Amino acid sequence: MEAEETMECLQEFPEHHKMILDRLNEQREQDRFTDITLIVDGHHFKAHKAVLAACSKFFYKFFQEFTQEPLVEIEGVSKMAFRHLIEFTYTAKLMIQGEEEANDVWKAAEFLQMLEAIKALEVRNKENSAPLEENTTGKNEAKKRKIAETSNVITESLPSAESEPVEIEVEIAEGTIEVEDEGIETLEEVASAKQSVKYIQSTGSSDDSALALLADITSKYRQGDRKGQIKEDGCPSDPTSKQVEGIEIVELQLSHVKDLFHCEKCNRSFKLFYHFKEHMKSHSTESFKCEICNKRYLRESAWKQHLNCYHLEEGGVSKKQRTGKKIHVCQYCEKQFDHFGHFKEHLRKHTGEKPFECPNCHERFARNSTLKCHLTACQTGVGAKKGRKKLYECQVCNSVFNSWDQFKDHLVIHTGDKPNHCTLCDLWFMQGNELRRHLSDAHNISERLVTEEVLSVETRVQTEPVTSMTIIEQVGKVHVLPLLQVQVDSAQVTVEQVHPDLLQDSQVHDSHMSELPEQVQVSYLEVGRIQTEEGTEVHVEELHVERVNQMPVEVQTELLEADLDHVTPEIMNQEERESSQADAAEAAREDHEDAEDLETKPTVDSEAEKAENEDRTALPVLE
């Protein structure tokens, strides 16, 4: 039973592989789940990284180093060849027409290290070349050629990181080369009588590319399947012997990687021709001299760096750098700029200027490029990018807001709700600004804090300075806040007598108080009415000043902090206010009557005294 179960588990289903490939190909064509875009000759190919890494060693190594690259541009491969390789990767089919097309696909497959594609091309070449070999075998064995070489040069162009051409010269010594017709095909491509042929291949820019290209040169002469092996000619009369000394030179360079470019003056070696060329400048007699301090430098880059670091303010800049360029120096951090636009953008970091404004949400930016990025998010309403404010879009009218409060107030228009409530008159409002306007107009309540200073009046009497106070009632509690003293217009008052309370509380201190005339006496200030409604400020509405004898005297009255402890606000209703006003009117009427009695009393007394004197004179004198 166990053996049968094992056999059942080992069953294979070849159709499953085909089904998986078909599904992956459909996803690629419909651009679903693709995670890489390959750009070849300006054409975009969508694919899956896992599939490419499974079929190509090149992509396997590349995706290990660069895991987050969404776009990859491939150079050195034609668009047609890459399309065939992509189709082969997802369908296992090759649809190639013509030998030229097959050669392009072969080169691309070798570059991308797609071994399965190379095997498929080898099978195709064998099938196409089999009938031709049967017909031409006899002729090829009889034909031989002789090629006379006179110092021909095979040059290989190597692309480097600095994008400068590097040439490797291989000298082929004079001699006679005898090669069979099968092996001469490759040699004819790279050598001809009294000419130098360049074989250019730009497949990469790394150090290993030099070895790969050199190996590609020699591989054309050492392929075993072509049977065109080249050997040194030990006997000149042997027709089957060959003599190519140049190939030995190439093999010698391949065995010494570090000796590709050798300096004969100091015995140093370099892998890249650019480094070798820069090194050779150190042996040259040319030098760059600083005209200010007479220092000499072998390299131009070192000379320019010296001028910029030490002699920039003294004008030590080369003529090439001085033509039409101005140096702009930041006055805040002393940073220097060649372009005025960069200098102006840098200044905005210090000044905080933001001249570019969004027409939709009125947000301002220091750079125009930042505004353009913001407009993309602001116009579409999909939300701003990293570092920018979040946007809120109304699903009803598509309006966009950059703050939650604005968005919430806008939604009320569509819902019809009135969440803003006035607790004084029980009215409801849709917008918050409508409620604030109602409180200001109907109830005389403003949102801002209105400070009321105790009015101060100047006097000739020396008094102690006191800070003005504002009393604010909030939630049934009274808070006294100190404020700066504010001088107001002086009041014209007459002073009748010095109030005794002021003297007792030490509010008035003057050594010359006794010198004041008796007619000049200090009056008092009377506060008319104080509003103490809950939730509002307490402020002075009226100021009454008594006038006696119409004598203009500047009086300054002050409240001391010690007296504020005795101030206790009383909440009065409307009836208490009316009764207090009636009592005040009654007291004023009684005072007026007393004043009239005082005026009439001296007249009555004088008449009674006169009558008494007359009576005394009328009486006879008794002896």
UniProtKB/Swiss-Prot annotation:
Tissue: Predominant expression is found in different brain areas such as the occipital and temporal lobe, the nucleus caudatus, hippocampus, and the cerebellum as well as in testis and thymus.
4Fe-4S among keywords: no
Location of the BTB domain: 34-98
Sequence motif Nuclear localization signal 2, location on chain: 317-328
Result after altering residue 610 to R: No effect on sumoylation. Complete loss of CBX4 sumoylation
C2H2-type zinc-finger residues: 261-283, 288-311, 328-350, 356-381, 392-414, 420-443
Effect ascribed to mutating residue 477 to R: Small loss of sumoylation. Complete loss of CBX4 sumoylation
Keywords noted in UniProt: DNA-binding, Isopeptide bond, Metal-binding, Nucleus, Repeat, Repressor, Transcription, Transcription regulation, Ubl conjugation, Zinc, Zinc-finger
Cross-link for Glycyl lysine isopeptide (Lys-Gly) (interchain with G-Cter in SUMO2), residue positions: 289, 295
Listed Basic and acidic residues bias regions: 573-617
GO biological process: negative regulation of transcription by RNA polymerase II; regulation of cytokine production; regulation of immune system process
Annotated family: Belongs to the krueppel C2H2-type zinc-finger protein family.
Full protein name: Zinc finger protein 131
Organism expressing this protein natively: Homo sapiens
Taxonomic lineage: Eukaryota, Metazoa, Chordata, Craniata, Vertebrata
Gene: ZNF131
